[in-house]
Amino acid sequence: MTNLTISKNKAFLFYIMKYLNKKDIKKTEEFISLFANVKKCKDEKQIDMLTALYGSGPAYYVFFNEIINNAFLNMGFNKKDTILYTNNLMLGTSKLIQEEPKAEKLLRSIASKGGTTEAALTQLKKNRVDALINKAIKQAYKKSRKILLK
C-alpha cells in the first residue's frame, strides 16, 4: 500500500513475517523504525483492513479538505486565502485531536448548543455522512482482499 505520510515522519508500516526468525524480525523492525512506526500484524486480513483505513486514509482527509476548499471558494474567498485557511484548519484540528483524542469531548467543546457548528453537524448526521464514509472504507477493504486473492 502507498504510504505518503512517510515523507513527513508520520507513517506506520504494517507487516507480517511468518517465515523469519526473531533475530531477522528485530533487525527488520530496527531498520524500518528509522523512517516509520512499525506494527506487526497477525494476518493478511488485518493488513487488508489497515490498507483500507490507514493506507487510503490520507485520501479521505484530502477529499474532505477539498470539500472545505470548495466551500470557501463558493462563498467568494480567493484561492490563495482558501488554501491558507483550509491548511491551517486541518493542521490546527490535527493538533487538537492529538491533545484530546476523544472525538465526542472535542466536538462538545467546538459545537455550542444551538450554534452554527451544531447546525452543520446535525445536517451531516441527518444525511448519514458517517454511513457513507464507512461504506466507502468497506469497499476499499473488499478491494484489498480481492487484490490479495488474485
Which residues does each PLM region occupy?
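Short, charged, surface-exposed secondary-structure boundary motifs
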Residues: 7-11
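Short, electropositive, low-hydrophobicity segments enriched in small/polar residues
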Residues: 59-61, 118-119
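Short coil/turn segments
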Residues: 2, 18-20, 55
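A short glycine-threonine-serine/GTX helix/turn-capping micro-motif
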Residues: 48-59, 107
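Internal alpha-helical scaffold of NAD(P)-dependent oxidoreductase catalytic cores
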Residues: 12-49, 60-99, 143
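NAD(P)-dependent Rossmann-like dehydrogenase/reductase catalytic/cofactor-binding core
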Residues: 84-87, 91-150
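Rossmann-fold dehydrogenase core element
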Residues: 1-4, 29
